[in-house]
Regions:
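Glycine-rich phosphate-binding segment of PLP-dependent enzymes
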Residues: 50-69, 83
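PLP-dependent class I/II
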Residues: 1-7, 17-19, 24-27, 31-38, ...
Length: 402
């Protein structure tokens, strides 16, 4: 008799990490179902609804029957609108034929890697940095290699460490500005220096700029795209999720070198086929009619950032950097704790505050936690008070965090 053979998870899939954000959220939801109050500082999602014009555009598209397949690259109208917007916002002429629409930003990052990285080639990514970079590089059978950000200088790019990480097997560098989780931004001189390194070593740069509109203190975002020439290998990644509070719409895009457009379109044809047309209509409405809405949302984020920064600065047990963009704080815990993972669990179970441990963002995130201020000021203030209470309790060493 032939024994039943169980389906075994592949080696590649075994190497992928699960999202820490959703894991913490799941635990928090279980606690809430049991009647416990949880203050949510873990998920990186704007607590706003999309601009009304977006929903109206989607309704109209559905009423018109735009519910069938459309072009894999994305409808022409949206690509033209993105090109116009990006030309104006980033200060460089964009060809609509270089724009590709995907369901969120992750697929365009994944497809860029799939279309340009061969097995065994190395891809550099920031540490601390967005937790999916390492998994996506692993998924395409590349070799993920972290480079450090200098926390003592506002999480600026550590070029000494970056240079040591580059070798003959290096194929690409991922950058993220503003940064998740640190909120830091790469400066113009850093971007120019990075571009020179990429030119010298013939490296691809993947620039994740999904937080580029969420900037504070009247500063302007500087994109590496501002300095590229036709010969540079640079991919720009952006999304509607954060800018327009459209996380559930799953709408992102990439602006790519001409050589990568056809390979990525092939990957789309063989995977999700296309982004629904009615969702893309919402994207057009967001760009055309949502700019004042974005300004108001960013103003509210800045108000929260300033208030929470005041509260965090009063906590002796941490060191905190004031974020320039995005909606995260990434404080370092300066007392003796087993790990940020253990502390985050202790904080959730005993004080009802959900946040993310810094280890989820790389080795350099040890003893850090990520605090999302995408929540009401009332909840944020309450959560920070509990955060402080937990730190004081740990410092006294009278409470076990095991």
């Amino acid at each position: 008799m032939i024994k039943d053979k169980k389906v075994v998870e592949s080696q590649v899939c075994q190497k992928l990490t699960e999202s820490a954000s959703f894991a913490v959220l799941a635990t928090a939801k279980r606690m809430e179902r049991s009647g416990k109050e949880v203050l949510h500082l873990e998920i990186g999602e704007p607590d706003f609804s999309p601009p009304p014009a977006v929903k109206e555009a989607v309704y109209k598209s559905l009423e018109k029957g735009e519910t069938h397949y459309t072009t894999p690259q994305g409808i022409r109208e949206l690509r033209e609108e993105i090109a116009r917007y990006e030309t104006e916002f980033r200060g460089v002429e964009i060809d609509p034929d270089r724009v590709i629409i995907t369901p969120g930003a992750k697929p365009i990052i994944l497809f860029t890697l799939l279309s340009s990285i061969d097995p065994g080639e190395e891809v550099l990514y920031p540490d601390p940095g967005y937790l999916s970079y390492k998994s996506l590089i692993t998924f395409v059978v590349g070799v993920p290699v972290p480079y450090h950000l200098n926390k003592n200088e506002g999480f600026s790019l550590d070029f000494d460490h970056l240079s040591k990480q580059i070798n003959k097997n290096t194929a690409a560098i991922i950058i993220n500005s503003p940064s998740n989780p640190t909120g830091s931004m790469l400066k113009e001189e850093e971007l120019k220096r990075l571009l020179e390194i990429a030119r010298e070593r013939e490296l691809l740069i993947i620039s994740d700029e999904v937080y580029s509109r969420i900037i504070y203190d009247n500063k302007s975002h500087v994109s590496i795209f501002k300095f590229v020439t036709e010969d540079d290998k640079v991919v720009l990644i952006d999304s509607f999720s954060k800018t327009y509070a459209m996380t559930g719409f799953r709408l992102g895009y990439g602006i790519l070198p001409n050589e990568l457009v056809r390979p990525i379109v092939k990957l789309i044809q063989n995977s999700f086929s296309c982004v629904p047309q009615f969702i893309q209509r919402g994207g057009i409405a967001a760009i055309v009619n949502g700019q004042e809405y974005v300004k108001a949302m960013v103003q509210e984020f800045e108000r929260r950032r300033d208030r929470i920064y005041e509260l965090l600065k009063e906590i002796d047990e941490i060191q905190v950097h004031k974020p320039e963009g995005a909606f995260y704080f990434f404080p370092e815990i300066r007392i003796d704790i087993p790990s940020a993972v253990v502390f985050a669990q202790y904080l959730l179970e005993n004080f009802g505050v959900a946040l993310l441990p810094g280890e989820a963002f790389g080795e350099q995130g040890q003893k850090h936690v990520r605090i999302s201020f995408a929540n009401s000021l009332e909840i944020l203030e309450k959560a920070i008070r509990r955060f402080k209470e937990a730190l004081v309790a740990c410092k006294k060493s009278t409470i076990s965090m095991s």
